[in-house]
UniProtKB/Swiss-Prot annotation:
A single BP term in Gene Ontology: translation
Gene3D superfamilies: 6.20.370.70
Keywords: Ribonucleoprotein, Ribosomal protein
Organism placement in taxonomy: Archaea, Thermoproteota, Thermoprotei, Thermoproteales, Thermoproteaceae
Family to which the UniProt record says this protein belongs: Belongs to the eukaryotic ribosomal protein eL34 family.
Entry annotated with the keyword Nucleotide-binding: no
GO molecular function: structural constituent of ribosome
InterPro entries, A to Z: Ribosomal_eL34, Ribosomal_eL34_CS, Ribosomal_L34e_arc-type
Descriptive protein name: Large ribosomal subunit protein eL34
GO cellular component annotations of the record: ribonucleoprotein complex; ribosome
Coiled-coil boundaries: none
Length: 84
C-alpha cells in the first residue's frame, strides 16, 4: 500500500518500466495551469505561470485588480462604477 500522502488524487500516477523489467508507479505533482479570471474564465494577461518562485506582487500587472480579474472583467466593472 502506498504512503498516505500518495493515496490522494492530487498527485499523478505514472507507470514506469524499470531496467529489471518490472513496472513501478512514480508519483508527481500535477502541473499548474495559467491563472484564470473568476468572472470570465479567461487566462489573466501578464501573469506568467512559470514564475512561481516570486510573490504575486512581483509577477502581477500593476493595474487595479491586476492578477485577479481579466482585462474584460475589469473594464466592465469600471464602466459600471462610472455609470453609478
Amino acid at each position: 500500500m502506498p504512503r498516505p500522502a500518495y493515496r490522494s488524487r492530487s498527485v499523478r500516477r505514472i507507470k514506469v518500466r524499470t531496467p529489471g523489467g518490472r513496472t513501478a508507479v512514480h508519483y508527481e505533482k500535477r502541473a499548474k495551469g495559467a491563472p484564470r479570471c473568476p468572472i470570465t474564465g479567461l487566462a489573466i494577461g501578464g501573469m506568467n505561470k512559470k514564475i512561481y518562485r516570486f510573490g504575486v506582487s512581483n509577477r502581477a500587472p500593476t493595474r487595479p485588480y491586476g492578477g485577479v480579474f481579466s482585462h474584460k472583467a475589469l473594464a466592465r466593472a469600471i464602466r459600471l462604477a462610472v455609470r453609478k
